[in-house]
């Protein structure tokens, strides 16, 4: 194997070879007989040719060096550009290690692998950018609805820059892509929600769903998947406006159906329509009772349904015209019942007799008369609602008066403490009755205050069967006060009577008195033997206004009142609080007045 020689040995061997060749050439020249001048000339040419060869070789070597250096510089520049584009900053790269190399070829050999590797990295990074950019452009087009102007604006802002292929830039693209994916998902869900709402509204209104959504965009009702669902702003706005339009139509139809159904229900009630006939429109009844937003039944607000209900109303109106007189009588009776229950005097201008006479004479249109009665019924219902609290208080007051009457009867029974059947029940009843009776004054005062407050609010008198309630209550308070005075006078008289009897007995001795009857009064509901006392009997509410203070009245639909009868009794004669036989009463009165000769007062 040949060894590479050093420059010194190479120069020595070259000189030796040249000297040998020169000596051989001189020998040839001698043999030829060349002159010295010719020899010098040929030697000069030979030397010149050698110099030219050396110079050419040196130039070639210099050019080769320059090319190698230029290649190295170009590679280094490309590597630097790739590193900057990829965002790679490696302090241990081969470019740092090349400074220790001895030749340009070694330097080139060191950086070329790095260049190839960076080029591969750039190609791979470019593929990632191109793929993400394509997805971004596609989603941007879907969101913008493939609008050229908007699409160019969004894509232009994402123009690919090959000088910036860093991971930071790639992450920005990926973040943008994820943002578009989320926006697409949100828009798609919103479109689906809108479409579902449109489907529900179309079902309720009986409108063709496919035709409705196709007016917004054909892709919303495609069954072939040739085109994806459009999620652009125009589609969302179109669906929003379509929903608003359908809801407006639903409101109009709902109100129309409600009005028509209301008329139908009134006619049903007037005509006493059977439940079987009403069942055909059960769904309509449900709609009227529901709120507009709760209606989801298909075709319930369709034009056909509304027309069917309207046709039914027209049919009943024709039937109503033929039965108008009967309906007027029926509604007038209903009005009188309402007035009786509310203790309000009914309008006499539409009484049964007058209504019948007006209809038979033809002076009044039955429809107008019926409308007038209907208005009066509604007015009575409203007034009865406002009077309800006071009427309830009146009922409680009357119940307390019944308990008071029963307690009076019970206290007059001398056998009330006997151990007979039902005695303990009557004792408990009496205890409850005393508690209730003690509350009567406060009940009356509160009722008066409540009534006056009602009169202030309504600016009219509270009439109870035609008589002002406050006047009734004031009369009751006055009568009750007279009753209390009568009780007090009786107690004083009884005390004086007992005192005189005792004095008489102490002077003249006691004498037997007639034996009293053990019979017990059982009027006004008291039953000494029954376990539960019956309710005091009352008359019905048919009394006239002139009998208000002399005749019992009805104060409720379930009970009859005996209070006004009691008021009259209290106002004409004192109550008999203790049952005293006639003989004892006469003797006692004579004793008190001193009419007997044996009496101390007589003496």
UniProtKB/Swiss-Prot annotation:
One of its GO terms (cellular component) is nucleus. The record marks 419, 430 as: Microtubule binding. The keyword Membrane does not apply. Residues 501-559 are annotated as: Disordered. Residues 48-79, 131-186, 468-502 form a coiled coil. GO terms for biological process: microtubule cytoskeleton organization. Residues 515-526, 537-559 have a biased composition (Polar residues). Gene3D superfamilies: 1.20.58.1520. It comes from the Eukaryota. Keywords: Coiled coil, Cytoplasm, Cytoskeleton, Microtubule, Nucleus, Phosphoprotein. InterPro entries: MAP65_Ase1_PRC1. It is found in: Nucleus; Cytoplasm; Cytoplasm, Cytoskeleton, Spindle pole. The modification Phosphoserine is found at residues 513, 599. GO terms for molecular function: microtubule binding. Belongs to the MAP65/ASE1 family. Forms dimer. Binds to microtubules (MT). This is 65-kDa microtubule-associated protein 7. It comes from Arabidopsis thaliana (Mouse-ear cress).
